[in-house]
C-alpha cells in the first residue's frame, strides 16, 4: 500500500452542488433559496437584529462600573517565594522587590505592585520592598529577623 493508493470509502463524501447553472440542473435560477425576500439576498443576518423585537443586549440592564481608584495588587505567598529561593532564582542577600520577583518568575508585573501573603513557610531572613503585605506575612517575616518596607503605590496615570 502506498500513499497514492489511499482514498475515501465509496459513498462517504458527497461532492458539493454547484448552484445557479441553469434550470435543468435542479438548482438554477433561485439556487435553492426560494423566492424573493431578505433570506434570498446575500449577507442575510444583521448581527443582533431580532426581527424588530428589542434585542437581548438592549433588554438586559447595564451593570457595575470600573473604579479608577481601585488597587490591583499581584498577590504572592511566602511559600512561593521560598520555592524561588530553593530553586536559586532569588538572591537572599538582595532586597526582594517587584523587579526581583518578576525576574525570578514568581509573578507578573501588576498595575499597583505586589502584596505579600502569609500562606506557606518562609525559612530565609529577607528584606522586602513591596506595596502591601498581610498581617500574617509581616509577622512571619519579622519572626525570622527580616524586615518589610511598604512602598507607596504609584497611580497608573503617573506612569503614562
From Swiss-Prot:
GO terms for biological process: translation. Gene3D superfamilies: 3.100.10.10. PROSITE patterns: RIBOSOMAL_L15 (PS00475). InterPro entries: Ribosomal_uL15, Ribosomal_uL15/eL18, Ribosomal_uL15/eL18_sf, Ribosomal_uL15_bac-type, Ribosomal_uL15_CS. Residues 1-35 are annotated as: Disordered. One of its GO terms (cellular component) is cytosolic large ribosomal subunit. It comes from the Bacteria. Residues 1-14 have a biased composition (Polar residues). Belongs to the universal ribosomal protein uL15 family. Part of the 50S ribosomal subunit. This is Large ribosomal subunit protein uL15. The lineage of its organism: Bacteria, Pseudomonadati, Pseudomonadota, Alphaproteobacteria, Hyphomicrobiales. The gene is rplO.
